[in-house]
């Protein structure tokens, strides 16, 4: 069972539809016990970083997500949800994030339209389980005005928008997509299927303990 975190700022409906399409069992929840009982977690998000962190704090979900991230349970952040995984953001004001990944969220300063909205090429950097069946140079769908300034060793996908935008990051059990896999057609569905596979592998490992 995959828990989709419901904190009032997520693109939950489209994530739900995507998981339903790939045959993944899921629950939409903000209940701490349900999140801990899940086999994997998706943190979606649309909106402002500081407001999102305030809501997560109010719901006591900061601690929960940090515990999930520091365990071996698979965690996938999408768009703002990915940004929240980092140490802090410069959006509106300096604001601390979940600090599960090293790096800072900075505003895009490019000679192009902001937000970066629409399809862009994703160049793979290295191989991870979520790249199974995903071709290098596939196009994915973005909507964002901020990007992750983070170490190269956690970047597994890059798109060019005047700067090198980390489109996909990963470290251990933690994954983050700056783009929207749930809106990225067949490629996005394949990435979510791969995440489902990682979740199932983790679940099997727990049953054997």
Swiss-Prot record:
GO molecular function, one term: lyase activity
Superkingdom in the source lineage: Bacteria
Residues of the Glutamine amidotransferase type-1 domain: 1-205
Catalytic residues (UniProt): 79 (nucleophile), 180, 182
Annotated EC: 4.3.2.10, 3.5.1.2
Classification via InterPro entries: Class_I_gatase-like, GATASE, Imidazole-glycPsynth_HisH
Cellular localization per UniProt: Cytoplasm
Subunit architecture: Heterodimer of HisH and HisF.
Function according to Swiss-Prot or TrEMBL: IGPS catalyzes the conversion of PRFAR and glutamine to IGP, AICAR and glutamate. The HisH subunit catalyzes the hydrolysis of glutamine to glutamate and ammonia as part of the synthesis of IGP and AICAR. The resulting ammonia molecule is channeled to the active site of HisF.
Name the UniProt record assigns to this protein: Imidazole glycerol phosphate synthase subunit HisH
Organism: Bacillus thuringiensis (strain Al Hakam)
Lineage of source species: Bacteria, Bacillati, Bacillota, Bacilli, Bacillales
Gene responsible for this protein: hisH
């Amino acid at each position: 069972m995959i828990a989709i975190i419901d904190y009032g700022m997520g693109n939950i409906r489209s994530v739900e539809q995507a998981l339903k399409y790939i045959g993944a069992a899921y629950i939409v929840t903000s209940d701490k016990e349900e999140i801990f009982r899940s086999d994997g977690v998706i943190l979606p998000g649309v909106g402002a970083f500081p407001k999102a962190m305030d809501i997560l704090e109010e719901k006591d979900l900061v601690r929960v997500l940090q515990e999930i991230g520091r365990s071996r349970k698979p965690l996938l952040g999408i768009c703002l949800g990915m940004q929240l995984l980092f140490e802090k953001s410069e959006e509106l004001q300096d604001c601390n994030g979940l600090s599960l990944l090293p790096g800072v969220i900075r505003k895009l300063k490019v000679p192009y339209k902001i937000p970066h909205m629409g399809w862009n090429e994703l160049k793979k950097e290295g191989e991870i389980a979520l790249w199974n069946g995903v071709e290098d140079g596939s196009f994915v769908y973005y909507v964002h005005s901020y990007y992750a300034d983070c170490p190269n060793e956690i970047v597994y996908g890059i798109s060019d928008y005047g700067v090198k935008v980390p489109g996909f990051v990963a470290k251990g059990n933690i994954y983050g997509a700056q783009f929207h896999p749930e809106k990225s057609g067949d490629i996005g569905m394949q990435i979510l299927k791969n995440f489902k596979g990682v979740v199932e592998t983790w679940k099997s490992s727990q049953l054997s303990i």
